[in-house]
């Protein structure tokens, strides 16, 4: 593949943008090499500035569940733009969006729109602290909830790639209010709540970890956390920025049958546009300003164009059989990847929940953060580049989940597996 134009753009970007990018994982630091620059996207494909086409399993990090540039979403955006870009005042779309979310996710009796997943999680923990009168927050090793100071403590995703336990600039006093548990460890969670349960305002978790690759919860684990939070008066917060409306229509909470107190959502509710939301029980959400004393605001919250895009996408995912079909395709992809790896003599295991999957270069079943970090990362990096050169784009980090969309049809999956058969041989080194 020719990458001359991408190389030229990256050289320019490095003079003006820190690391040449606006989000660290895009820089390919983990896998080596340089990123390609996208010119357009359509369906299951990205097209770069050099004219190369890639099957996309990143999906803008999850939200493009109906594929890129879907005609219905595109038409909704065009119609909304004709009426204006931003009002700074209420619009009908945000009411319809709230009605849609509360109908599809019953634990969310009320919702507040924001502008990103990070903003949603920051607002949710502020609400948890304000509602309980407590200060401590519990999170999990390998889970990532955005770049808020309270979360950059043994964080996953980009922070895990950089190999540092926290970020400079986070006050020690604030980080001390964040308690970190090993994911999928029943005993550790019980012990922590027995010791400090009276000080814990809330526990925030990715119900399926998507930022240390894809790690599903052990059977009964989420139920265990729900019981601990209820017993000790802490709020259970599900970060469904990745899993919401993807692993099931009602998100991971519907898939696993758990009712959290608060839920955060990200750009999937904006059809991929910059947007987020948080919601929960009415008595909690009524404490948010102006109804209550806990302050949170946003000039662009409920943006009319983002609401139109999100509503169009959420209409599509409600079609009968949508999620079952995606789950079946994901299962077929994962089985094919494991078979191709076995044929090449490469130790690989996969995980999946709905249309979200993980690929680990290990023979072990991965259920913990420690197991994820112990995988053969150099082998993944070789595999990544071998796939990329054949026109298949995986997340440029061994610590990120993969995502399918309804545009990933049988032909796309077969093309992916054909590339994988070649790439696994390259991964052996």
Curated annotation (Swiss-Prot):
The keyword DNA-binding is assigned to this record: no
Organism, scientific name: Stenotrophomonas maltophilia (strain K279a)
GO molecular function, one term: transaminase activity
Protein name: Glutamate-1-semialdehyde 2,1-aminomutase
HAMAP family: HemL_aminotrans_3
Any single Pfam family the record assigns to this protein: Aminotran_3
Record lineage: Bacteria, Pseudomonadati, Pseudomonadota, Gammaproteobacteria, Lysobacterales
Pathway note: Porphyrin-containing compound metabolism; protoporphyrin-IX biosynthesis; 5-aminolevulinate from L-glutamyl-tRNA(Glu): step 2/2
Enzyme Commission number, as recorded: 5.4.3.8
Subunit architecture: Homodimer.
């Amino acid at each position: 593949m020719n990458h001359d134009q991408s190389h030229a753009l990256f050289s320019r970007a490095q003079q003006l943008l820190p690391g040449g990018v606006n989000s660290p994982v895009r820089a390919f630091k983990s896998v080596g090499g340089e990123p390609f620059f996208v010119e357009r996207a359509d369906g299951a494909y990205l097209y770069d500035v050099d004219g190369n086409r890639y099957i996309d399993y990143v999906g803008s990090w999850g939200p493009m569940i109906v594929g890129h540039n879907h005609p219905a979403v595109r038409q909704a955006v065009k119609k909304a733009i004709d009426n204006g870009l931003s009002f700074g005042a209420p619009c009908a779309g945000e009411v319809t969006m709230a009605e849609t979310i509360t109908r599809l996710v019953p634990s969310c009796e009320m919702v507040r729109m924001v502008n990103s997943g990070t903003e949603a999680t920051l607002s949710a923990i502020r609400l948890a602290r304000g509602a309980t009168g407590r200060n401590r927050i519990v999170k999990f090793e390998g889970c990532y909830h955005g770049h808020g100071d309270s979360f950059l403590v043994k964080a996953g995703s980009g922070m895990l790639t950089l190999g540092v336990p926290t970020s400079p600039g986070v006050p020690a006093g604030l980080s001390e209010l964040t308690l970190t548990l090993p994911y999928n460890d029943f005993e550790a969670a019980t012990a922590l709540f027995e010791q400090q349960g009276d000080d814990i305002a809330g526990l925030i978790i990715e119900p399926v970890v998507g930022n240390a690759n894809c790690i599903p919860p052990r059977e009964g684990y989420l139920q265990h956390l729900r019981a601990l939070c209820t017993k000790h008066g802490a709020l259970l917060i599900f970060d469904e920025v990745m899993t919401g409306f993807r692993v099931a229509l009602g998100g991971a909470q519907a898939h696993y049958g758990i009712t959290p107190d608060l839920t955060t959502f990200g750009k999937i509710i904006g059809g991929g546009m910059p947007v987020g939301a948080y919601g929960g029980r009415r008595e909690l959400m009524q404490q948010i300003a102006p109804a209550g004393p806990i302050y949170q605001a946003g000039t662009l919250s409920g943006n009319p164009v983002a609401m139109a895009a999100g509503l169009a996408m959420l209409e599509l995912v409600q079609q009968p059989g949508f999620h079952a079909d995606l789950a079946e395709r994901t299962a077929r992809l994962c089985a094919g990847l494991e078979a191709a790896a076995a044929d090449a003599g490469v130790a690989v295991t996969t995980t999946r929940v709905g249309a979200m999957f993980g690929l680990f270069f290990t023979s072990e079943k991965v259920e913990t953060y420690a197991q994820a970090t112990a995988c053969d990362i150099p082998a993944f990096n070789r595999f990544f580049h071998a796939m990329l050169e054949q026109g298949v784009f995986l997340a440029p980090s061994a610590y990120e989940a993969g995502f399918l969309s309804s545009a990933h049809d049988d032909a796309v999956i077969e093309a992916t597996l054909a590339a994988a058969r070649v790439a696994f041989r390259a991964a052996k080194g």
